[in-house]
Structures are given as structure tokens and as C-alpha cells.
């Protein structure tokens, strides 16, 4: 039986990190990248207008953090946090995170998420 394809988005203020995640998603047959957002405000609008299954979410972003974004969403998709810091790991799992990936993300670690 085929795995369902998950519609996903990336929310990260770093262009380089978004490109890195895009390449990983493009090589994963179960993921369909719907959109990329460089800040949480744009993501909030996009997520309100689209049915998304999975979000690759940075935590530290200008104006609105990844946690703030989740607090503002009425429908919460599955979340994989993507950050360079470990200090948010416990809080991330308070949001029922699927996983917590540290930047830079290796292909092996991404596939295990």
C-alpha cells in the first residue's frame, strides 16, 4: 500500500535553510511542498487558506516566532521544528512536535523525522 502524500510548507527566515529543506523534500516521494514562507506572518495567512498536513518550522524569526505562529493557528498541522538551538526542544514537544531537527540538517536525520 502506498504511503499518503503529505502536503507540507516550510517557514524559515533563512533563504539558505529553506533551499536546503526544499532539496530534501523534493527527494522524498511522500512529501508535496505547497509553499515556502520567510516569516511567520506570511505563513499564518497561507496556513489559514490552505489545508496543510506538515510544517517545517523555524522557531527564532523576526516579529513572530514559530511558537507564536502556532499559538495563533486554529487548525494545527503536524510540526517538525527546524532550528539551530537545542534550548527549545522541551518546549517544542509541548506543541506535540513530530520531531525537532537541528540545523544544518543531514539527509539521514531528515529521513528519520
Where are these regions (language model features)?
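Two-component/phosphorelay signaling modules centered on CheY-like receiver
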Residues: 14-35, 72
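Hydrophobic/aromatic residues located in beta-strands of well-ordered beta-sheets
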Residues: 8, 33-34, 79
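CheY-like receiver
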Residues: 44-47, 53-113
Amino acid at each position: 500500500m502506498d504511503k499518503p502524500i503529505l502536503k507540507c510548507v516550510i517557514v524559515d527566515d533563512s533563504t539558505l535553510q529553506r533551499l536546503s529543506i526544499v532539496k530534501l523534500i523534493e527527494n522524498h516521494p511522500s512529501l508535496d511542498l505547497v509553499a515556502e514562507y520567510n516569516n511567520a506572518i506570511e505563513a499564518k495567512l497561507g496556513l489559514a487558506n490552505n489545508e496543510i498536513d506538515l510544517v517545517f518550522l523555524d522557531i527564532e524569526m523576526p516579529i513572530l516566532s514559530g511558537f507564536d505562529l502556532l499559538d495563533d493557528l486554529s487548525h494545527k498541522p503536524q510540526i517538525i521544528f527546524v532550528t539551530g538551538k537545542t534550548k527549545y526542544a522541551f518546549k517544542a514537544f509541548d506543541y506535540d512536535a513530530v520531531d525537532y531537527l537541528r540545523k544544518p540538517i543531514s539527509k539521514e536525520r531528515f529521513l528519520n523525522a
